[in-house]
Amino acid sequence: MKISELGYDRAFLQLFDGNDFQLYDHQRMAIEQIRKGRNVVVSVPTAAGKTLIAYSAIYETFQRNLKSIYIVPLRSLAMEKFSELSRLRDLGLKVKMSIGDYDDSPDFIKRYDAVILTSEKADSLLHHDPYILNDVGLLVLDEIHTIGDESRGPTLETVASIARYVNPDVRILALSATVSNAMELASWLDASLIKSDFRPVPLKTGILYRDQLYLDGKRRSGVSINQIIRETVEDNGQVLMFVSSRKKAEDTARDLAQIFGSDANIKISSDETNVYDDMLNEILPRGVAFHHAGLSNDQRAFIEREFRARRIKVIVATPTLAAGVNLPARLVIVRDITRWGSDGISYLTNMEIKQMIGRAGRPGYDQYGIGLIYVSSQSSYEAAKDYLSTDPEPVVSYLGNEAKVRFNTLAAISMGLARSPSDIMKFYETTLFFSQNGKDLLEEKISASLKFLEKNGFIKQSPDLRTTQLGKVTSDLYIDPESALRLVDFFDGPADVDHAIYYISLCREIVPFNIKDDYSAMEFLDDIGLIDGDIDAAKTAIVLRDWISEASYKYLYDKYGIAPGDMQARISMADWLSYSLAKLSSIYKPEVRRMLEILNLRIKEGIREDILQLVLIPGVGRVRARRLYDAGLRSIEDVASASPDRIKAIYGFSDTLANAIIRRARTIASKEVR
């Protein structure tokens, strides 16, 4: 069967640039099951055409005048999917992506035909109104195997379970990598299973044991990693290498760059001084880059974009890349199969290895992909053989985590899904955790959660279970109840910035900064009168204090060793928690709300209070705002009335940018006058 034989409008073919492809068997079978009104789990390798199945399901749902929600586990994947699914606009669909604010109303979904959300965003929207799902005909769960991820998995599982509980008629399309218990996942979702090992680009896997290459049943001696990489690049291929640490990614990329000439005209630059710009610009002209979570969001996006454009030929990355965006290459090398963790050295999981190697072979460019594991000892060689010859681990639910049960129990009561302990159990019966673990363990966890929530003032029984004002606000804000208690503690003491950032830093959502400056942390605690306070929270607080004093990323890296990407991740969470603190002030201390709202904006932007107005102008971040302020333009009105020549004279402002900023400032100023 070809795409044209699906019976769709001819414009559907344009989603594939007019190419009338023959459907793969698993695509045809999945679409057949979807047309029968079945839930479907599709378990196939990377780049095996799952997107076409999603296109088809979303388009058919649109033709039935129903909406589709597409769930992904990561923001980077949401942006990638939005770029792909936006092509459906040519068929008349209204497509929207939403990945930010967790306090939004879900009403906007009614205005669109297809909405792309992260798991967390979807879950937070359902906290406000789960019955929005009654307007939804299709729920696409991408990367459903990530349910087995301890940190991200429970949220995806929760969204799927709420959907099935609230609207049993919603169709579910779950897209998965190859997993060993795909049938169990299908059974949980009451779905048909479509499973295949087919790959459009064949994959060859092997082991490089020191200088011995074992590939396709053959052995080749005297082979080095550098040699294989050079041969691949010279044959117009691209390479991904995975290593165990950031430092190793940087050092290995620098070493590999030496084997190539500086032919590529690639340079990265940021508005703000950033330690990694210089490091990358040393090797980018040679077509090599490193990629890890310490890079800023913009730096990672730049590297991914240049790799897709085939200007960057080699990326050395940590395993975070394999869990993120779809970035295939002809050759994938897993350089390290172990990593350091809190419990010492451990082996990567089979699923992680398969996710990395599965990226070998770029459709449309490569006739085949090669996935290699490099090892240097006999024991590692045996481990590598096991990786290549065995299936990935089964997907196991982590929804029974104590904090997750407490969080979801409060949410179920707040959403109106549960009015009694038995109602809560009915909800949990729709989860994978229940199907894998049964009732007894859950009853114990639910009982403990209810006691905690009632004791701490989140719920009450009268006689039905109801949320208090604190419980409702906590659930709507999408924060952990324990974190809400930490934030509430703030209102019992001095209402100043230092105390606020300390209590924000106490919250479990913020991973403490691992800095060695105990003295400054203890001094901070002494200054705020909490000498026996939490030293890890104090360390985070002093970094946040530097951030809102406009410390640059370079300064923070030089002083604390904090990479830009790590800083951005903490800022994002501190932004949300400071917003939550301002919301909670309406209950506990309304007179400090304005101060907390200002602090929220300062954390979001990394600014002192004097440039608050200027960062409200679109396109003006903290660096440009400070330059405008120092040049005497200290308000939106000042910018709106300035001449382009005056702004153009400020460092970093082009003629185009100056005119755009003036225009935007005038728009804001005119609205304020009205």
Swiss-Prot record:
PROSITE patterns: HELICASE_ATP_BIND_1, HELICASE_CTER
Motif DEAH box mapped to chain: 142-145
SMART domains recorded: DEXDc, HELICc
The reaction(s) this protein catalyses: Couples ATP hydrolysis with the unwinding of duplex DNA by translocating in the 3'-5' direction; ATP + H2O = ADP + phosphate + H(+)
Keyword Phosphoprotein applies: no
Protein name according to UniProt: ATP-dependent DNA helicase Hel308
Organism: Thermoplasma acidophilum (strain ATCC 25905 / DSM 1728 / JCM 9062 / NBRC 15155 / AMRC-C165)
Annotated binding of ATP, by residue: 27, 44-51
Function according to Swiss-Prot or TrEMBL: DNA-dependent ATPase and 3'-5' DNA helicase that may be involved in repair of stalled replication forks.
Oligomer and partners: Monomer.
Keyword ATP-binding annotated: yes
Enzyme class per UniProt: isomerase
Chain's gene name: hel308
Family the UniProt entry places it in: Belongs to the helicase family. Hel308 subfamily.
Segments forming domain Helicase C-terminal: 224-411
UniProt domain Helicase ATP-binding: residue ranges: 31-197
HAMAP family, sorted: Helicase_Hel308 (MF_00442)
GO BP annotations, alphabetical order: DNA repair
Keywords: ATP-binding, DNA damage, DNA repair, DNA-binding, Helicase, Hydrolase, Isomerase, Nucleotide-binding
Cross-referenced InterPro entries: DEAD/DEAH_box_helicase_dom, Hel308-like_dom4, Hel308_SKI2-like, Helicase_ATP-bd, Helicase_C-like, Helicase_Hel308, HTH_61, P-loop_NTPase
One GO molecular-function entry: ATP hydrolysis activity
UniProt EC number: 5.6.2.4
